[in-house]
Regions:
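Regular secondary-structure segments
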Residues: 59-70, 234-238, 242
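Metal-dependent nuclease catalytic regions and adjoining charged, substrate-binding loops involved
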Residues: 5, 10, 76, 159, ...
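Short acidic (Asp/Glu) and glycine-rich catalytic loops that position anionic groups and cofactors
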Residues: 34-42, 59-62, 91-92, 165-169, ...
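Hydrophobic (often cysteine-bearing) scaffold residues that line and stabilize catalytic clefts
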Residues: 50, 54, 108, 181-184, ...
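C-terminal, charged and often intrinsically disordered regions of DNA end-processing helicases
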Residues: 1-52, 279-291
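A non-catalytic, helix-rich entry segment at domain boundaries
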Residues: 61-133
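Mg2+/Mn2+-dependent nuclease catalytic core
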Residues: 135-230
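Short, polar/flexible loop-turn hinges at active-site or ligand-entry regions and domain interfaces
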Residues: 42-51, 67-73, 174-175, 244-245
Length: 291
């Protein structure tokens, strides 16, 4: 999955579209229902961090790398893609440009360059072609749950096997964050199962900061069970969405939350609930569950 979107703007100038479930939003709800509300319904802007901007630039550089002919995907050429990738990201996101001042830019680009070069210790991009990079995927399950997200890379072997690849610019995860990363990859595997009618042969997480790889082989029955898990999460979200009852769930990650000032657990008051963008979603799901 790509690094988080760095788009700016206020919650008032963003259109309220029909909600869908992505790996990030599902993770938000599991972590803290109120965080889900702030991000998915109120859409309160968050200031990007240096690490997020760095991850976005790395993703942009690797996407540009795979757009080159196979023989040109060498380390020196990849290094040349770093600055143009930054220029695209900073042009699209004024917040990102402000976060990295001119006097710090060379050091920042050096950080990005090291991560891009680490990639070559894990894969040789001159030996294969990706079928697609930064792929938007979307499907709707039978019970009305809409799934969507972006896949960093999809590879298809000459024999037809599909591999789903995700770049991580942080270090290899511990047990908790490893399960979170695999949740994301199973999500994409399920979308491919429903859209392409295939089970990916491999889910591959590439950790560029630590120079390590995590692979996983899903099976059909496992993805069907995972589909039920997502349906249960969505049912809980819809129930909260109908009433506005998104409760905070304090934990260790609260120290890194942008919304502590609005959280009742820390003495704050959330903004007035704007209502679920499309209450018909709840009605459709309820009708299908009762048939």
């Amino acid at each position: 999955m790509p690094a988080p979107s760095l788009a700016g703007g206020t919650s008032h100038d963003r259109p309220r579209s029909r909600p869908a479930l992505s790996p990030s939003r599902a993770g938000d709800y599991k972590q803290c229902p109120l965080l889900y509300r702030f991000r998915a319904i109120d859409r309160i802007p968050e200031t990007p961090t240096r690490a997020q901007v760095r991850g976005t630039v790395v993703h942009a550089a690797l996407e540009a790398l795979f757009a080159l002919p196979t023989g040109q995907r060498v380390p020196d050429r990849a290094a040349e893609l770093v600055r143009p990738a930054w220029e695209r990201v900073s042009a699209d996101s004024p917040d990102a440009a402000e976060l990295i001042p001119d006097e710090d830019l060379d050091g920042f680009l050096s950080e990005v360059g090291k991560l891009v070069q680490t990639y070559y210790s894990l894969e040789d991009p001159t030996r294969f072609d990706a079928q697609a990079c930064e792929v938007y995927v979307e499907t709707e399950l039978e019970n009305g749950v809409r799934l969507r997200g972006f896949v960093d890379r999809i590879d298809v072997a000459p024999t037809g096997e599909v591999r789903v690849v995700d770049y991580k610019t942080g270090k290899a995860p511990r047990e908790f964050t490893e399960s979170k990363a695999l949740f994301q990859m199973k999500f994409y595997a399920l979308v491919l199962l429903r859209t392409r009618k295939i089970v990916p042969a491999q889910l591959k997480l590439i950790y560029l900061a630590s120079g390590s790889i995590l692979t996983y082989t899903p099976d059909h029955d496992e993805l069907v069970r995972f589909e039920r898990t997502l349906s249960a999460i969505w049912k809980a979200i819809l129930a909260a969405g109908a009433t506005g009852d998104f409760r905070p769930k304090p934990g260790k990650l609260c120290d890194w939350c942008d919304h502590k000032a609005l959280c009742p657990s820390f003495g704050g008051t959330p903004p007035p609930y704007p209502g679920w963008p499309d209450l018909r979603d709840a009605e459709v799901v309820a009708a299908k569950e009762n048939t």
